[in-house]
A protein has these predicted regions:
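Nucleotide/pyrophosphate-binding catalytic subdomain
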Residues: 1-233
Length: 233
């Protein structure tokens, strides 16, 4: 593919501005949680995939953890299945879980892999390994309300993820965990991304979302937070 003078100048400008970051994160693992509006618009999806491929091209090791709330909501509506939320978590019965597994584990996961490959990087859908990677248990709220098949991460077994990284492949992971009974559980993608980043000792965790950032109870944006101030549900 050829580029004209203006395009070449733009590429040179971007690379020049990005050089300090390329040098800083060369060879480092970076976990990216991908969600929100960026997953719904074609131009944004392609832009995301292009940027991930570029990160790999310049020597970084991106690991993708994706959500899929809007797509799940749309599929549930089409199927005539009512959905509700408690404390921000989608109540997930068995009918809902069937759609959640299909949308997250098959459709979105594979679409992301295909888009990244389209920009010249190698990516792999990790869904088949989720049972061994994300070990979880049912999430219980203090209010005692039943969320159904909603989970929390108990531990991350990162062996398969590291294998892909070592082979130069970008792992693409859906937020589906499994408990000791073998039940599939729907888990908040932000929480999964955080646990995976910690397990891999990721250099940085990036959350791509349409929420401005961490907010206090009244909605005011918090620019800095420490461990004592942070609350984990």
């Amino acid at each position: 593919m050829s580029v004209d003078r203006k395009q070449a100048q733009n590429i040179a400008s971007v690379l020049s501005e990005g050089l300090p970051y390329i040098q800083r994160f060369y060879g480092k693992t970076i976990v990216i949680k991908y969600g929100g509006a960026a997953m719904c618009k074609t131009s944004l999806k392609e832009g995301f995939a292009r940027d991930i491929a570029l990160m790999k091209l310049v020597g970084m090791n991106p690991v993708i953890v994706h959500g899929g709330g809007p797509q799940i909501g749309s599929e549930l509506k089409s199927a005539g299945i009512k959905t509700s939320f408690i404390s921000g978590f989608r109540v997930t019965d068995r009918k809902t879980m069937k759609i959640v597994r299909r949308v997250l584990g098959q459709e979105i996961n594979k679409e992301i892999v295909g888009l990244i490959k389209g920009f010249g990087a190698e990516a792999f859908a990790m869904t088949r390994y989720n049972k061994n990677i994300i070990r979880s248990s049912k999430l219980k709220l203090n209010e005692g309300k039943d969320l159904g098949l909603v989970g929390k991460v108990e531990s991350i077994q990162n062996k398969e993820i590291k294998k892909k990284i070592d082979k130069g492949v970008i792992p693409v992971i859906s937020p589906l965990g499994f408990n000791r009974k073998g039940e599939c559980l729907n888990i908040n993608a932000d929480l999964v991304a955080g646990k995976i980043a910690s397990s891999l000792k990721s250099e940085i965790l990036i959350l791509l979302t349409d929420v401005e950032g961490i907010q206090e109870k009244k909605g005011k944006l918090i620019s800095k937070i420490n461990k004592k101030e942070a609350k984990v549900s």
